[in-house]
Amino acid sequence: MSEKVFTENWDKEITEESLKHTQIPMMVKLLGTTDEKGWPHLTFIASSRAKTNKQLVWGQFLHGNSKQYIQDNPKHSYLFMSIDMPFKMLQIKANFTHTLNKSEDLDELNTGDDMRYSTTMNFFKAFYSDIVAASQLQKISIIKLLKNIFLSKIGKGGIKSNKEEEARLDKFGKVIFTHALNPKFIAYLDPNDDYPIIVPCFQAISHEHTKLVFSPSLFKEQLSIIPTDSKVAVFGMTMDFIAQVVKGTFLGFEKHRGINLGIIDIEEVYNSAPPLPGLIYPKKAVLPEISEFVMP
């Protein structure tokens, strides 16, 4: 079956080349988990890396939802992508195993370049995972990437406008998801085993700030099997590291101007970055300010 094409060839451990790839300090390092509603969730975890060919480790220095999600549902995933040309990508499925509040790994993380001179915060907990399956280290064609961005833009112009729908992206979300060259990554749950799959999707762009659309030509075998009406998450960021996560329903593929486009209905927008990670859209109700107190 087509669902198994790309995962059947994954290995049960990573190669030495892939292990070294995860040690690069400046790169995209994403963690894919499943939230309390059963939706995929994406978080940037800069400290994540392979400890051995079969184990991964990363450090926690802030409290966030993904740390709870990974403990509630041990099935999760990683994507490691270099930011220098040519882009190289590694995808991993893993099972969470345990945490440690004291370990050599924590000491190494806290004396690394990222935290060595920090006087306000340090990693206080290490998370460990066993590798279940891993892709080979693969190059991403910049030519194909740019072609997909072009196709998404052309196809988007053929989608019928609906000005009555409420915009769901704030000013930062509009910047992130309007500019096609901003890095974006989509996550969905593998229909075979429910592990999150993380796929680069730079070509995902906003349509009237209510939907995201993308051409599936690049990584077609991974994007084309996203189940219609399933929940997906899209992590987007600018080159200044302003980041948001969009979640919603994948409506399926439609042809516009002769171009096949995947369409995502935006239902939630999440800020995953400090100092205030949390839900942006839909907005939470704000209680009125209390200015008078009446004693009974």
Which residues does each predicted region cover?
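Binding-site signature for planar aromatic cofactors or substrates
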Residues: M1-P296
